[in-house]
């Protein structure tokens, strides 16, 4: 058994030494680049180093699991072959030295790009001579190159020394399963029992260690495995990125690029698409090579700065409201608000997933079919409503029901304008209802005192609340008295009731009278019949705005989630620089809108709806009837303007997404 334990010590020693060397490179990066830290930051630096070890350990466990399993299982059967340990030492040394090389290269890369190494570096491999000349010719890179070679040499020598030290205690002639570690065969029953017990003990320890290593690869016990978002713990982008393993960052970015949903769209040439999009949005300013839609939106009068509360309701299709033809009284609160607020009749979600709704509503960027624009090894940077309001002195809060890692929300929102993030990790575990976290009522109950605290600080705030209950699995509280019998409709009643309760409690707060409320859905869901290739209920959603100075009115023009930001800032008379796809609906009436699903692109005007499926290469054309229903037509020629509009807008978004990295 001693030999077995020393074998474990041999592997563990290399593992720990590798983590220490990677931490050394992180320390060097901090020392060299600490001036990049936020000037007024108060976050503890030590947390970044702890998270860095955490991510380094994930990568280390990936390379450790094979030699660990092979050596321990062989040892269970009495095999302590020297060549196996040599192979393991070489295997681990090569990989840890590779990781050190990536960590060393990451320091000057981060200094230049303010991001960790990602798959974009492979674009340099096509210019070997130029890249080599840059690395050798730039004197500021030499210290890191020298550091790498010194560290690699020391690590290799250290592993060699450690191998020799442990080898003296492990090496002995190969023995069989029924031999003791001393090499003598026990012939009496007691000796056989002891040998069998030792075998079982080794097997159990091996299974436990291999299991721990696999758990180390997963990185955490939560619903999701570890993701980049886990490194984000404060408002300082330098410290958040310091806690990410450069190797982990590089590998996951490569995997991201290989995902089918991230394949480049080719609907029309980029130059034609951009020209059309700029013309459609009325942009006349000089074009930037990458920020092709950039323009300044001037304020039309003195700015007002009310508080802002945005509620994005999960899957709340307009078809669930009696206002839009629902036969059952599922949403009395929303229907009442619709009649007494600034409400929008023909309003559509950008996509059919939550991440699409968030990106479009808050940052005015449209959905790109199935692609998740909040995720990525390199967290995307976007300007939008949170960043503009933060510049105006707002304190921004985001409340979600589920884990903050979901859809990379923690990293994305901290990077793009939010000061505080509240998620499942913030709530008592006893309140978690399912894999999507806490129910809507608890979300609102938790958020209200936090909002009160933000309001008491004296400055304006923006609070964004993302609900979840109207998403399977539906969990309707037993105490909830509903009018309907099916869980799928009962949960809509519950979601609507939660809005009523929150607004009733908010109405008692001193900040209520100076707050703009925006209520909409993140996307819709299938309700009723399949009325087209992409049923309208998936994207047709309510938009309700009320607050100080907002006169109740019904807006019957077209609009989508990308219009929320410019419309809301227009109501507040705030000027801003803008890269988005939206318009202020109260000052400019849209002639057309576009949106997508995972496999379809939709463009529509008041009379027609065009749907294109790129995978099938097919178009579907519909006339919009007076009652809002669709009737398919095969007169494709009439739909060419809509086709061009939809293709141009989506292709422009594709261009901007690819050039924002």
Residue ranges and their predicted role:
Residues 2-260:
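Transmembrane and membrane-interface helices of multi-pass
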Residues 3, 7, 45, 83, ...:
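Exposed alpha-helical structural elements
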Residues 21, 118, 125-129, 244-248, ...:
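Alpha-helix initiation and N-capping motif
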Residues 52, 56, 104, 134, ...:
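Residues that form generic nucleotide/phosphate-binding pockets
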Residues 127, 176, 236, 243-248, ...:
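The feature marks either
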Residues 280-661:
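Solvent-exposed soluble domains appended to multi-pass membrane proteins
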């Amino acid at each position: 058994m001693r030999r077995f334990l020393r074998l474990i010590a041999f592997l563990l020693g290399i593992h720990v030494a590798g983590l220490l060397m990677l931490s050394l490179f992180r320390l060097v990066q901090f020392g060299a680049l600490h001036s990049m830290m936020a000037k007024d930051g108060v976050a503890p630096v030590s947390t970044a180093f702890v998270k860095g070890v955490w991510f380094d350990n994930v990568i280390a466990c990936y390379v450790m699991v094979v030699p660990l399993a092979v050596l321990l299982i062989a040892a269970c059967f009495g095999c302590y072959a020297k060549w196996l340990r040599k192979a393991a030492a070489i295997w681990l040394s090569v990989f840890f030295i590779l990781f050190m090389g990536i960590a060393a290269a990451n320091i000057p890369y981060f200094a230049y790009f303010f991001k960790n190494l990602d798959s974009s570096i492979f674009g340099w491999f096509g210019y070997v001579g130029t890249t080599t000349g840059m690395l050798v010719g730039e004197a500021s890179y030499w210290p890191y190159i020298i550091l790498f070679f010194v560290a690699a040499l020391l690590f290799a020598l250290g592993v060699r020394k450690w191998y020799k030290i442990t080898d003296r205690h492990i090496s002995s002639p190969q023995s069989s399963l029924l031999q003791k570690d001393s090499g003598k065969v026990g012939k009496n029953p007691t000796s056989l029992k002891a040998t069998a017990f030792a075998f079982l003990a080794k097997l159990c320890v091996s299974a436990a260690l291999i299991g721990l290593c696999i758990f180390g690869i997963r990185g955490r016990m939560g619903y999701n495995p570890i993701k980049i978002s886990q490194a984000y713990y404060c408002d300082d982008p330098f410290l958040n990125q310091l806690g990410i393993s450069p190797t982990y960052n590089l590998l996951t970015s490569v995997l991201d690029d290989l995902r089918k949903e991230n394949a480049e769209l080719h609907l029309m040439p980029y130059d034609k698409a951009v020209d059309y999009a700029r013309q459609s949005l009325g942009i006349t300013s000089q074009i930037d090579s990458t920020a092709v839609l950039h323009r300044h939106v001037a304020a039309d009068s003195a700015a007002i700065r009310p508080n802002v509360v945005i509620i994005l309701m999960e899957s709340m299709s307009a078809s669930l409201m009696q206002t839009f033809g629902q036969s059952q009284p599922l949403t009395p609160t929303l229907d009442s608000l619709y009649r007494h607020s600034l409400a929008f009749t023909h309003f559509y979600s950008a996509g059919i997933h939550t991440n699409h709704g968030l990106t479009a509503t808050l940052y005015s960027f449209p959905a790109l079919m199935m692609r998740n624009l909040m995720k990525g090894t390199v967290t995307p940077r976007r300007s939008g409503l949170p960043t503009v309001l933060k510049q105006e002195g707002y304190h921004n809060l985001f409340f979600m029901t589920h884990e903050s890692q979901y859809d990379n929300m923690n990293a994305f929102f901290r990077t793009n304008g939010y000061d505080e993030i509240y998620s499942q990790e913030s709530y008592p575990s006893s309140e978690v209802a399912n894999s999507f976290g806490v129910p809507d009522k608890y979300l609102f109950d938790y958020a209200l005192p936090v909002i009160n605290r933000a309001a008491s600080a004296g400055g304006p705030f923006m609070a964004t609340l993302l609900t979840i209950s109207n998403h399977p699995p539906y969990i309707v509280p037993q105490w909830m008295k509903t009018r309907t019998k099916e869980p799928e409709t009962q949960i809509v009643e519950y979601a609507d009731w939660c809005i009523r309760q929150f607004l009733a409690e908010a109405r008692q707060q001193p900040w209520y009278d100076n707050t703009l409320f925006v209520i909409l859905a993140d996307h819709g869901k299938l309700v009723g019949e399949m009325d087209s290739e992409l049923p309208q209920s998936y994207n047709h959603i309510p938009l309700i705005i009320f607050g100080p100075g907002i006169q109740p009115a019904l807006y019957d023009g077209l609009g989508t989630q990308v219009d929320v930001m410019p419309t809301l800032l227009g109501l507040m008379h705030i000027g801003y620089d803008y890269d988005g796809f939206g318009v202020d609906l109260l000052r400019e009436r849209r002639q057309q809108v576009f949106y997508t699903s995972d496999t379809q692109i939709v463009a529509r005007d008041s009379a027609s709806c065009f749907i294109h499926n790129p995978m099938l290469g097919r178009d579907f054309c519909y006339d919009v009837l007076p009652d809002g229903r669709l009737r398919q037509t095969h007169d494709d020629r009439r739909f060419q303007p809509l086709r061009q509009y939809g293709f141009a807008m989506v292709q422009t978004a594709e261009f901007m997404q690819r050039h924002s990295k």
